[in-house]
Amino acid sequence: MKGLAIFITSLFVTMSVSAQTGVETDSIDTSAFDKYLNEIVIVAKKPGTVVKTDRKVYTVNQDLMSKASSASEVLNHIPSVEVDIDGNVSMRGNDNVTILINGKPSAMMAGKTRADALSQLSAANIERIEVIDNPTSEYRAEGGGGIINIIMRTDTKQGFNGSILANAGSVGRYNAGVNLNYGIRNLNFYGGYTFRRDRYDRTVDDYRISPSDTITQTTYGLGRPVSHTFRLGMTANITSADMLSVSGNYNRRNFKRDEYVDSRTRDLNGIVSDSYHRDRDADAKENMWEGTLQYTHRYGNSNEISIGYLYSSESEDELNRYTTMRQDVETRNNETVWDADYIHNANLRWQHALTDNIRLTSGYEFEHLRAEQNYHVSDWDGTSFIPNTDESNDFTHLRMVNSLYANADMTFGLWRVNAGLRGEYTDIDNQLKSISESRRKHYFDLFPSARVSRHIGDDIELSTGYSMRINRPQGSDMNPFTERINPLSLEAGNPDLKPERINTADFGIRWLSNAGSLTANLFYRHISDGITEVSRYIDNGILLTTKENLQTSHNAGVELVWNMRVTDWLDINLNGTGYYNRINASRLGFGGNREMFSWSGLLNADFTPIKHGTVQLNARYHSATLVPQGKRDGDFQLNLGLKYDIPSINLALFASVTDLLDTYKLSYTLDTPALKQKVEKRRNPRIIYVGLSWNFGGGSRKQHHNVEYDEEM
């Protein structure tokens, strides 16, 4: 951190400290200047990735591609995190990941539309992303793979200030946004608006072999989503010890989809025995609402009590119009899908320092989730559409979770110990309204967690941790009614699914220096009753995909994260993960254990070849990974970002190219005695954006006594 400046009315003091990528700096003692200073403003460029004892923190503002990208694209640039072509998020090979917004659950991240929500959440509105591999008991126990906490942008500057962002992309993509902030005395108001227009081109090749025939399907899809996002918030320092914050956001998205499927079935002699062509014309309207209220009271030395409430809802109303030509016979049918999630969350948190070295955190959390899934089909009889009650259903999933937790953080010399326990009582009610049936489940679990760390000198830290977590089935996973994807593909849930339970342990070493940091972690994960997707043939070559519980699975490996400032003009972040995965699939009838070693690599490199100019490279490779019925093939992606700053007018120019080499795809192979299937999905290549951002307004930040990074650098 160079050019650190402290400004006063008649005195100017310049200080210099190090802020290399991934290095945590010590606090700066300013007591010698206290009688002269009214306000301290410390300016520095944030490091892109900081690896802490219990988490990785990724500063989105330092990712050049974030200026035009969505949250899902930025997540793919973070160590430990992977996002596939369908928007599914995983960590270290485990896709049971909990995603929080500002530390709280969100309906946008709770249901089947999570991938769509991430693709429409503008990365420019994100402050930072925290990746927590092995959370403590203070966090809700959901998410066996870990927690991703997305922290949205806010500002605390006095006066009126803001920023404007605009981007234009290839094949009709556009996005733009404005963020405003107004701070006056102890009040701060902020708001923003974001517009996104995207285009998704998809090609899917599906090749299946059964004992009696082969099926070849090719799907061409085009999606054109348009979204509008509004956000508004306020923070009020009522007194020096009391703070109230209120915030809300609304997102509306219209999504048009066109799809064409060509399918051919051949017998064992290679003769076409069946074929069809299917056209899909779909319109979807999505609405997402969210509001939060939080009150915090601070007392004593670092003690506080807070109470909060959150309401979050997401709904999708979709109309699908299908026309199918099969053996020279045309059929038409309409499918309407209503998919909605409603979340109420209330929390009480108490933090109290028992001594100078022992801090206790405890709390209560209540969460109520209502998930609705209504699927109605009507068939054309030549004159009108007639409801098809055999293929229509209404399903509601209700889930209440009551949680109590206590967590102690203790320091003994060079040792730090964190230990906690969380208890969660879960009540689930699955309502099959079409047949007036209700299925209830309830259970109680205890989730312990512990972490011990020790410093060796100023540069090395050792840590080890353990936690137990759970992954509860989503409502759609337990809906037993069948949804027809196409004439030869069906999907259905499993009402008998059990929650999966995960035990995770890790051991890590972290080394810090003025030039960078190196972190190495060994991890082990044991999963009981793991929830997995299974495909099986039923009658007449129709493939049914559902969810089932595995017996056990084991995952063990090592992860390395290296942050290094190589020269004044080159910063590098390297991440490598290798792990061994073993699955016991005997419960599913696929034989005994299946096992595989997988690895992945991630490179983020920042070049500054000229003053005010930055070039950023992002490259990721992932080898083949294990699934219960086969494997997912490896993939590679290379991205490029460019930025040029014009400091005199607070303007920055950007350009980015996603998938520069047109190599990104998703393919998997299933291989069982009854089913052999190869699927390959590709998206539109080389997404290109050019854009600009402008920061405006002045005003100073509210007084702080800690190092504060300036967002405008």
Give the predicted meaning of each segment.
Residues 172-198, 213-259, 287-289, 294-297, ...:
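Transmembrane beta-barrel wall of Gram-negative outer-membrane proteins
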Residues 39, 71-74, 114-117, 131, ...:
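N-terminal periplasmic accessory domains that precede
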Residues 146, 150-161, 203-205, 227-232, 315, 427-429, 458-505, 524-545, ...:
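Surface-exposed extracellular loop regions of Gram-negative outer-membrane beta-barrel proteins
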Residues 21-64, 84-86, 94-96, 132-134:
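Short, acidic, small-residue-rich periplasmic hinge/interaction motif at the N-terminus
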Residues 594-713:
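Conserved C-terminal beta-signal and adjacent last beta-strands/turns
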Residues 71, 77, 105-133:
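Short acidic/polar hinge/loop motifs at secondary-structure boundaries
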Residues 218, 334, 343-347, 389-392, ...:
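Outer membrane beta-barrel strand-and-loop segments of large Gram-negative receptors
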